[in-house]
């Protein structure tokens, strides 16, 4: 039997007597792509940090890729988990080239701390090529557009061939055209036979495309609901999630949200 990619059991997280996550149980099977949906401040970022070993739960059990956190080498695990966040852009050395940023993903590091081989640079260039971003390989990060930077960060996450890819609100800062191009690229990636299991974190239902098979709603640090998109993305659930009357519409395969207040 294949082990789940993610298995959280009764995870709680407290900081300075404040409970941020409560009784989170979540199981993700290989190849099952999920969206994690919730309002700002609901605990999404903390949950991601727990999944990647940057925070430790106060209570509960975390298993990722069959390994129980606390009983495995977290450094090695991070090389198997790709994490893309717009916040990462601020931590990148401004003068690093795009291909340097991608290559740093081989070590799960921010910046380069060793000499990379020609083969490693070629592998990095190949991932950029697959994402249609080969032309920016030698450009400094500081000169890249937001859309180009997102492709570079995706390439950085993919270069080590991760088994789990976490995208933390990747469309923040993108104009409508750039966002649609990005979502199209992501859909193509998800449909590849060797694609990693993907978790897309967002608070916009418009970004939940048909390749996403499951949705988890997080509210006030607790699981509000989880299941297939058609069952979860409803007027009732969205109104409860955002504490505001909402209507949900379909335009073809796309979800649309209207605030009714």
What does each of the following model-derived ranges do?
Residues 165-169:
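Catalytic Walker B motif of ABC-type/P-loop ATPase nucleotide-binding domains
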Residues 52:
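Helix-to-loop junction immediately C-terminal to a conserved catalytic motif
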Residues 118-136:
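Conserved ABC ATPase "signature" region
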Residues 6, 20-23:
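Conserved structural motif at the start of ABC-family nucleotide-binding domains
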Residues 161:
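Conserved catalytic motifs of ABC-family nucleotide-binding domains
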Residues 115, 140-144:
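Conserved ABC ATPase signature
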Residues 60-70, 77:
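Conserved ABC transporter NBD signature motif
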């Amino acid at each position: 039997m294949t082990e789940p990619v993610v298995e959280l059991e009764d995870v709680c997280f407290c900081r300075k007597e404040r409970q941020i996550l409560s009784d989170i149980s979540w199981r993700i099977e290989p190849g099952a792509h999920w969206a994690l949906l919730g309002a700002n401040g609901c605990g999404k970022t903390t949950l991601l940090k727990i999944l990647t070993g940057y925070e430790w739960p106060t209570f509960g059990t975390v298993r990722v890729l069959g390994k129980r956190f606390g009983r495995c080498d977290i450094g090695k695990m991070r090389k198997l988990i790709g994490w893309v966040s717009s916040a990462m852009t601020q931590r990148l050395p401004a003068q690093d080239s795009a291909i340097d940023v991608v290559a740093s993903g081989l070590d799960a590091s921010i910046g380069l701390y060793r000499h990379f081989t020609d083969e490693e640079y070629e592998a990095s260039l190949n991932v950029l090529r697959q994402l249609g971003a080969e032309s920016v390989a030698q450009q400094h990060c500081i000169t890249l557009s937001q859309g180009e930077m997102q492709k570079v960060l995706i390439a950085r996450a993919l270069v080590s061939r991760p088994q789990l890819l976490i995208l933390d609100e990747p469309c923040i800062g993108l104009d409508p055209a750039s966002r649609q191009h990005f979502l199209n690229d992501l859909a193509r990636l998800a449909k590849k036979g060797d694609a990693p299991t993907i978790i897309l974190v967002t608070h916009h239902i418009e970004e939940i495309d048909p390749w996403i098979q499951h949705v988890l709603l997080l509210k006030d640090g607790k699981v509000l609901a989880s299941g297939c998109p058609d069952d979860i993305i409803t007027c009732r659930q969205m109104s409860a999630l955002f504490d505001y009357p909402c209507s949900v519409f379909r335009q073809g395969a796309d979800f649309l949200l209207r605030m009714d207040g």
